[in-house]
Curated annotation (Swiss-Prot):
GO terms for cellular component: cytoplasm. Keywords: Cytoplasm, Isomerase, Porphyrin biosynthesis, Pyridoxal phosphate. This is Glutamate-1-semialdehyde 2,1-aminomutase. GO terms for molecular function: glutamate-1-semialdehyde 2,1-aminomutase activity; pyridoxal phosphate binding; transaminase activity. One of its GO terms (biological process) is protoporphyrinogen IX biosynthetic process. It comes from the Archaea. Its main location: cytoplasm. The modification N6-(pyridoxal phosphate)lysine is found at residue 268. Belongs to the class-III pyridoxal-phosphate-dependent aminotransferase family. HemL subfamily. The gene is hemL. Pathway: Porphyrin-containing compound metabolism; protoporphyrin-IX biosynthesis; 5-aminolevulinate from L-glutamyl-tRNA(Glu): step 2/2. It catalyses: (S)-4-amino-5-oxopentanoate = 5-aminolevulinate.
């Protein structure tokens, strides 16, 4: 694939990178053909690469940069903290301040345990659910991504009633034998699996909006159904809000959809561009973590003062007005995608919620992972490359989502819509 854009320096760096970094990248999704562009700097809603190209960014580091890149308030706060130290190994007051802010926002949050990533957060939440219930089995949904740890890195498409098979070499089948897979938005499948595993299921973990398979929305009443059936059967409900937390609303998907889970995990936006994650939930469960309880969870950089400082400064800016503005931007782009697809007679389905959106090149509605997989991924990549050539960067995968930030202004949206029109016309 030859791109009609100057990327000589990025090509050189990629060839060099492959000598030292596996595949030339540190996370697989960053790799795309013929090679990824290498970023030199970022500001507001723009990425600037090593060849001097400017890209309007709708990937936003896969979600965290909701205030835009290099936000001055965050940078100033972090610089001040760095003068005071970057890691302590003992508590600091700022951990309390951020915990209070999380508790004030997230409906289920009565206590918090800070960790270093979304992966650590979901891993800890599942361990906590198993520990407090004394049960081993968990339910996850096909296509849902809850981090790269063994219990949830499970092959999808195995059917609602079969035990999961590992999705990666290096994971023993015994590790995932207690992971039950179910299609998203399928109430009957949930009922059946719970019925056939009575009193054995510790938790259901889900992304309230499936953001790691594009943007699959919960059907009306589905989250309420999950809340009711888990309560009826003594199963903990875990909302993985690593993507939706602080993005759909101040209180994330729980506030947006009016559903209160037992536990929730957050990350991404919480760190304002720095590594962080958090497990939150009801006090009766959270206090079972050590040192109060017997369920072990620990980390050298848990509650890191730099990440916590960035988190405090980020959440200060996320009020109701902010969400109205970022949602409006995503609505404009989503509507334009629908109109442009119709204009050029392209089969496409566009889904959006708050400041998250994605287009699937598909004739049918996308409500499950299997629906998403049936989309025309080759067409999506042609769409991606044309956008890139016209100065717009979205995640290089049909199975990721796009985000708006507060920095995507009217001029930026106009340029984006022009690029979308060119890309759709070329399809």
């Amino acid at each position: 694939m030859e791109l009609n854009i100057k990327m000589d320096r990025s090509k050189e760096l990629f060839e060099e990178s492959k000598k030292y970094l596996v595949g030339g990248v540190n996370s697989p999704v960053r790799s795309f053909k013929p090679f990824p562009f290498f970023v030199k700097s970022a500001k507001d809603c723009f990425l600037y690469d090593e060849d001097g190209n400017e890209f309007i960014d709708y990937c936003l580091a896969y979600g965290p940069m909701v205030l835009g890149h290099a936000n001055e308030n965050i940078l100033n706060a972090v610089k001040s903290q760095m003068d005071l130290g970057t890691a302590y190994g003992v508590p600091s007051e700022k951990e309390i301040l951020l915990a209070k802010e999380v508790i004030n926002r997230i409906p289920c949050a009565e206590m918090v345990r800070f960790v270093n990533s979304g992966t650590e957060a979901t891993m800890g939440a599942i361990r906590l659910a198993r520990g407090v219930t004394g049960k081993d089995k968990i339910i996850k949904f096909e296509g849902a991504f809850h981090g790269a740890h063994d219990y949830v890195l499970v092959k999808t498409g195995s059917g609602a009633l079969t035990h999961g098979a590992p999705n990666s070499p290096g994971i023993p089948e015994d590790t995932t034998k207690n992971t039950l897979l179910i299609p998203f938005n399928d109430e009957d499948a949930v009922r059946k699996v719970i019925s056939e595993n009575k009193n054995e299921i510790a938790c259901i973990i889900l992304e309230p909006v499936m953001g790691n398979v594009g943007c699959i929305l919960p059907q009306d009443g589905y989250l309420q159904f999950l809340r009711e059936i888990t309560e009826e059967n003594g199963i903990l409900l875990i909302f993985d809000e690593v993507i939706t937390g602080f993005r759909l609303s101040k209180g994330g998907a729980q506030e947006y959809y009016g559903i209160k889970s037992d536990l929730a995990t957050v990350g991404k936006i919480l760190g304002g561009g720095f590594p962080i994650g958090a497990i939150t939930g009801k006090k009766e469960y959270m206090e079972q973590f050590s040192p109060n309880g017997q369920i072990y969870q620990a980390g050298t950089f848990n509650g890191n003062p730099v990440s916590v400082t960035a988190g405090i400064e980020t959440l200060k800016n996320l009020e109701d007005k902010f969400y109205k503005e970022t949602t409006k931007k995503a609505d404009i782009l989503s509507d334009f995608l629908r109109e442009t697809a119709e204009k050029y007679n392209i089969s496409a389905k566009v889904y959006n919620v708050a400041s998250i959106f994605q287009v699937y090149f598909n004739e049918k509605e996308v409500v499950t992972y299997e629906d998403a997989k049936s989309s025309d991924t080759e067409k999506f990549m042609r769409y991606f490359y044309t956008l890139l050539e016209n100065g717009v960067f979205v995640a290089p995968s049909q199975f990721e989502c796009c985000f708006t930030s507060i920095k995507h202004n009217d001029e930026v949206l106009e340029k984006t819509m022009n690029a979308i029109d060119i890309a759709m016309k070329k399809l």
